[in-house]
Amino acid sequence: MFESVVQLLEEHEELQQQLGDPELHADASRSRKVNRRYAELSRIVAAHAEWTQLGDDLAAARELAEEDPAFADEIPGLEQALDAAQEKLRRLLIPRDPDDARDVIMEIKMGEGGAESALFAADLLRMYLHYAESRRWKTEVLSQTQSDLGGYKDVQVAIKGTSDDPALGVWAHLKYEGGVHRVQRVPATESQGRIHTSAAGVLVIPEVEEVEEVAIDPNDLKIDVYRSSGPGGQSVNTTDSAVRITHLPTGIVVAMQNEKSQLQNREAGMRVLRARVLAKQQEEIDAEASAVRRSQIRTMDRSERIRTYNFPENRIADHRTGYKAYNLDAVMDGALDPVVESCIQADEEARLDALGTDA
């Protein structure tokens, strides 16, 4: 069992030697890749060592129990621990999403529901910012268009992780947030106390780590400049600092007006554009992928209603995994881990079913 681990153990040793080579650290890109792979394999190495040790302990306990029945009491506990260690190792051997260690760019847009939808978009932004803070991730608001009541018609935020371990990566956790988020509550603008249903859309894409990773020909870009506007459309700048970038081959349009400098807005716009072009390329690859890939949770389906936030009942429900809890107030304050973990587990189960093997 777990014959494939032997090769991974050898690879882990090779990477460990590479990490001790000063020349590796002179190449930032290669160093990052080696560190990430080493961190990923370190989990497998530790889990395999635990599984092996428990197997040895169980064998020893059974042998001793033949001579001294007192040792028989240890056997059930060791068997249970061995089964748990085996399941842990089995899950770690599931092929990971190659983008799991990447940082992300998240866009939250108001949907059906007008002003209430924009307010909900602001609540979602706050939830994700608090969640990022709890995981010690760094956040940067790249662009925002506010509504009249203080919500957001559209807001884009970059979220950057602090670990080389793909299992702790930002994309590994937030890729499941893409889709339509529905809210049920009494809007601030509702005078009769009636519950309304509205929605906001969330798009999450992995960020491009190196400019060379996505080839964008400057001749394929149409760049327009204009004056920044605030809530209600009023101008908030006397210079043409806002930038709209159109990628002609794909039709992708990115608009930035958050910074006071046109150059800063252009740099931020290109950052988002590269990520969107990469995501589109990946979507095209996924569209041609096997049923194995398509059977997994649809992380990039922007039209899918993925979750409902019911404020009167303090209930949150994820429609993909069946997760339900009555702690919506805590979730909106950033306690999102249980929801995310339910998605990760469902994804792992789908991958295991698709593989059709016990590894």
Swiss-Prot record:
Keywords: Cytoplasm, Methylation, Protein biosynthesis. The keyword Cytoplasm applies. Its main location: cytoplasm. One of its GO terms (molecular function) is translation release factor activity, codon specific. It comes from the Bacteria. It is found in: Cytoplasm. Methylated by PrmC. Methylation increases the termination efficiency of RF1. The modification N5-methylglutamine is found at residue 234. Gene3D superfamilies: 3.30.160.20, 3.30.70.1660, 6.10.140.1950. Transmembrane segments: none annotated. Pfam families: PCRF (PF03462), RF-1 (PF00472). HAMAP family: Rel_fac_1 (MF_00093). Peptide chain release factor 1 directs the termination of translation in response to the peptide chain termination codons UAG and UAA. Belongs to the prokaryotic/mitochondrial release factor family. This is Peptide chain release factor 1. It comes from Clavibacter michiganensis subsp. michiganensis (strain NCPPB 382). The gene is prfA.
